[in-house]
């Protein structure tokens, strides 16, 4: 069966219509997206005793989806390792809101700076990796710790949800 794909512009237009014309707050869209990611992870780890999930978040709104997914996974009893590539102070808008919610719940999150080692052990030990580093709007070359992290994810040979 052939599946149709949507373009970046179509996705952005759908978000814009949902927010501006329908009136769905962007924070609600992020919550729904993150919950959907968590539900997909739950499907993929079904039957695994003590599943481990590694969530890798960038600094854009995609990170917010990752924080929401991580919250739902942790609340569902999953051991989730959450990494932010950068500093929490670099997050904006809805991603920053969900980062603060995550922190207020005292869930662990590790910030990875340019000079810090990548969490390769956690990536390799995970049953599922959630890539919340970049979203559909990425339009530049990927450099530095982001590039290295993506290479590590691809080499891990694990189930990846992005």
Label each region the model flagged:
Residues 1-50:
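Positively charged, low-complexity intrinsically disordered leader regions
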Residues 2-6, 46-58, 62-162:
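Glycine-rich phosphate/dinucleotide-binding loop and adjoining beta-alpha-beta core of small-molecule
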């Amino acid at each position: 069966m052939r599946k149709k794909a949507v373009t970046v512009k179509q996705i952005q237009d759908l978000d814009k219509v949902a927010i501006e014309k329908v009136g769905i707050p962007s924070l609600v869209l992020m919550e729904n997206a993150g919950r959907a990611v968590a539900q997909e992870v739950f499907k993929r780890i079904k039957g695994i005793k003590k599943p481990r999930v590694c969530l890798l978040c960038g600094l854009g709104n995609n990170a917010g989806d990752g924080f929401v997914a991580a919250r739902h996974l942790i609340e569902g009893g999953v051991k989730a390792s959450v990494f932010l590539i950068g500093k929490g102070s670099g997050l904006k808008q809805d991603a920053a809101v969900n980062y603060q919610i995550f922190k207020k719940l005292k869930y662990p999150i590790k910030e990875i700076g340019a000079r810090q080692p990548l969490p390769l052990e956690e990536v390799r030990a995970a049953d599922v990796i959630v890539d919340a580093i970049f979203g559909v709007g990425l339009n530049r070359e990927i450099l530095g710790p982001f590039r290295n992290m993506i290479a590590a994810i691809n080499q891990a040979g694990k189930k990846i949800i992005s």
